[in-house]
Amino acid sequence: MNKVIAIANQKGGVGKTTTAVNLAASLAATKRKVLLIDLDPQGNATTAAGIKENATTNLYNHYFENTSIEDCVYESSDGYKIIPGGEELIALEIAIRNDNKQGFMSKSLEPISLNYDYTIIDTPPTLNQLTIEGLFCASGTLIPLQCEYYSLEGVTGLMNTIETISNKNMSS
C-alpha cells in the first residue's frame, strides 16, 4: 500500500525541501519504491534530484497538454522517482483554482500510485492551491519547523487546514 506523506509548513526556510529529499533518498536506500513530487515553483527538490529544470515535463504539462502522468516521472540520482517542480506550477495553481478542479492531483496520481511504496510531496512555502492539493493526497503530514516564535505561529493554522481538508471530499 502506498503511503503518501506531505511535507508542509507555510513558512519558508524551515527545511521542507531538505526533509522531503532526504526522506525520499533514505527510503530509496532501503529498497523502497519512492516517488517525490515537487510542488514548489522554486523547484529545489527537482534540482537536488539531479534533474535539469528546463528539460522536464511536470504536472503543468499533464494539466494543460494532457501529457500522461507516467511521462512526468523522472529517475533521480539517488534512486527515487520524481515529478519535477518549476515556475510553470504558478500557472497550474491559478488554473486549478479558477477552473474549480480541486482534487486534480489526487485523480492524476491514481494510475501510478500502486507503483510506489511511498509518495513524498514537497509543498511550497505558502498555503495556496498546490499545498492544498498535496495535503489532500496525503495520508499523513510532516511539519518541519524551527524552534522560534514565527515558525511555531503558523502551525496551528496549518493543522486547522489539514483537519478541514480531511473532513471534505475535494474530488466531487
Give the ranges of each region predicted by the language model.
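P-loop NTP-binding core
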Residues: M1-S172
